[in-house]
Amino acid sequence: MTAQTQELTKAQQYNFNKLQKRIRRNTGQAIADFNMIEDGDRIMVCLSGGKDSFTMLDILMSLQKSAPISFELVAVNLDQKQPGFPEHVLPEYLDSLGVEYKIVEEDTYSIVQDKVPEGKTTCALCSRLRRGILYRTAKELGATKIALGHHRDDILETLFLNMFYGGKMKGMPPKLVSDNGEHVVIRPLAYCREKDIIKYSDMRGYPIIPCNLCGSQPNLQRQAVKQMLNDWDKRFPGRIETMFRAMQNVVPSHLADFSLFDFKSIDKNSGVINGGDIGFDKEEIAPQVVEDEDLVMEFDPSLQLNVTNI
């Protein structure tokens, strides 16, 4: 091994350690903030074969080893009988991890193809079918929580989709009760950036299985919103972080939803509410400082390589 190759390997190891630590920290923080996992929980980890769910399983298994509480993980994949689906990939990978898992075989592909006209988006029907099957499976496995791999970017995309097309300020909750009222659904990656997950997935070399039903369909509204947010992220560094922070700093008295705030009762005796407002001038917004968390691209001999994986 040449000195140059050795240095590159050290730089890659440093980058991996730093990235893994950040994703673990963000995941652990989300779990704590929303009380996602409790002692004795049996978590059904929904594994689609994509980068997000692979990363979620990886990080949850890592956290499981050092967590102050005890919880179980069982990975579940839904084989929807898509033509060309590599049935051997996930069982081989999960066997190598030594994690408990279940492959559920349901031919939802044929149902979707039969019910949805050619050229129309299959996402809505496919999603409903998957949810029903996964809820049933969670009950069969005795799972107390269902973990999904949605990340911070998914949550923001959903917020803008609802504003643009649904007339609602509604995102994707990090924790909720399932549609049938029988399960608690959690999103441990809610604080994680998609670009971090992409880098981490590439470094880990997961056996990614592409979805031929929804992600590959052109002209989807979500893809348009994703492209918009990616463009903002490149042109205005920090904007994505600030927007997500805004979702955790909602001020109902300064919006217009009278179901959330009693505007009718306000009079001059009400006093200043939530900092008041500027009546005739635009409010001055202080710029938000965003920490640059990019990884090192070249090896620096001064870097400490014994990074502790929290």
Swiss-Prot record:
It comes from the Bacteria. Its cofactor is Mg(2+); [4Fe-4S] cluster. HAMAP family: TtcA. The gene is ttcA. [4Fe-4S] cluster binds at residues 123, 126, 214. This is tRNA-cytidine(32) 2-sulfurtransferase. Homodimer. One of its GO terms (cellular component) is cytoplasm. InterPro entries: Rossmann-like_a/b/a_fold, TilS/TtcA_N, tRNA_Cyd_32_2_STrfase, tRNA_thiolation_TtcA_Ctu1. Pathway: tRNA modification. Belongs to the TtcA family. The thiolation reaction likely consists of two steps: a first activation step by ATP to form an adenylated intermediate of the target base of tRNA, and a second nucleophilic substitution step of the sulfur (S) atom supplied by the hydrosulfide attached to the Fe-S cluster. It is found in: Cytoplasm. Keywords: 4Fe-4S, ATP-binding, Cytoplasm, Iron, Iron-sulfur, Magnesium, Metal-binding, Nucleotide-binding, RNA-binding, Transferase, tRNA processing, tRNA-binding. Its main location: cytoplasm. Its EC number is 2.8.1.-. A motif (PP-loop motif) lies at residues 48-53. It catalyses: cytidine(32) in tRNA + S-sulfanyl-L-cysteinyl-[cysteine desulfurase] + AH2 + ATP = 2-thiocytidine(32) in tRNA + L-cysteinyl-[cysteine desulfurase] + A + AMP + diphosphate + H(+).
